[in-house]
Amino acid sequence: MSLRYAPLSTTRRPALAPKLVAVLAAVVVLLSGWASEASGGPRADWVGTWASVPTATPASSTPVVDNETVRQIVHTSVGGSELRLRLTNEFGAAPLRIGDVHVARRAAGTTIDPRTDRQVTFAGSPTVTIPAGAPMLSDPIRLALPPRTDLVVSIYLPARTPVTTLHGFAYQENVIAAGNVADDRTVTATRTVTQWFFLSGVSVRGHAQSVVALGDSITNGFETDINANHRWPDLFAARARGTGVLNLGVAGNRLLHDPNPPPGSDAEGYAAFFGESALRRFDRDVLAQPGVSQVIVLLGVNDLGHPGTTAPIEETVTAEEIIGAHKQLVARAHAAGLTIHGGTILPFKGDTLGFYNEANEAKRRQVNHWIRTSGTYDSVIDFDRVMRDPADPQRLNPTYDSGDHLHPNDAGMAAMANAIPTRLF
């Protein structure tokens, strides 16, 4: 727990006798020496270097992998001397059988550097069966990982496997190849996908700490260039050196509601990718991350815009309800000893998704005023002020607009990353 939340005591305690103090000091030194000898020196903790939000797959479009290898690329943040993977079968209805897993640093494209290839084991075994609904941590893997590295994770699935757990918006091209080619330098792709299958985290051994970016499609990187790693958390990681930056943004995510597409709507085909509400997923996606010490929250625009578009109009929320959800995130972060920073909601007048109306704009301004002035968050990152059009503050600055008037382009992502003071981390 952070010392910032430790209560101060003014109770006077009786002084210890000098001889007793000397004896206790000697014992502490002796025990410290034993601990260092047993561990081979000061122990480094695990810290997250990459993460994604696992979501369910729409029933109408569930991919299937059968005697195939899924080769996936993730872009890490902080480096370390060892790493471990976190796989997940969270939304699976049956056990997930994995026949082989390899990791390596990327050479180019989906080609690996064979000198860095390592087989991944689970309790010493190269195969693992993950129970339905469960995650699975790998054994530590001896592989030095420099900061901001492209890591290739190859997972072989020997039997017919519906991909029921994935991250739907990776903005990264990954490939599927026939057979077990997990340790091959290059693979012949039979399919290209832009999701991450069954993979939710990479952690490294080191002395760093991590910050979670908890958000929606703007944090997830919607409308950024594929394979470019231009999401604002990626760009911030280049500035926050020595800190793990974990992108726990997911497109379409809301603070207060899970996905609930109207029957018969187009949203039925993709709404599952929106993920569980931030209030529901906070413990898994924030508190359970290894080495996490801080959180940046940028959420609320979908709570305003989804009702009546991709969710029932009955799920319309008030500004007070959005503020109440933010207060709950802050309370839970502080209870865990974390520092939490509030991001103001970006403007979206004229958006092409049908989110904007005067009522939603009034709610956005009310929520942003509360974030800025209430003192509830430990600090405020005023994304709204950075991203708005000086000539029309209800709109995105055209320089930063992807074209849908809601999501930033790559230049906008860079502006958001630069708006975060590195002194906070």
Label each residue range with its predicted role.
Residues 326-337:
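Surface-exposed amphipathic alpha-helices with a cationic face
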Residues 3, 22-214, 220-228:
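N-terminal secretory targeting modules
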Residues 88, 156, 214-217, 248-253, ...:
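Active-site-proximal beta-strand/loop segments in catalytic clefts of secreted hydrolases
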Residues 50, 66-72, 95, 101-109, ...:
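Conserved SGNH/GDSL esterase-like catalytic core that processes O-acyl groups on lipids
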Residues 144, 284-292, 331-332, 425:
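Surface-exposed acidic, glycine-flexible loop patches that form ligand/cofactor-binding
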Residues 254, 260-266, 305, 345-425:
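Catalytic His-Asp segment of secreted/periplasmic serine-dependent ester chemistry enzymes
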Residues 1-16, 199:
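N-terminal secretory signal peptides that target proteins for export/translocation
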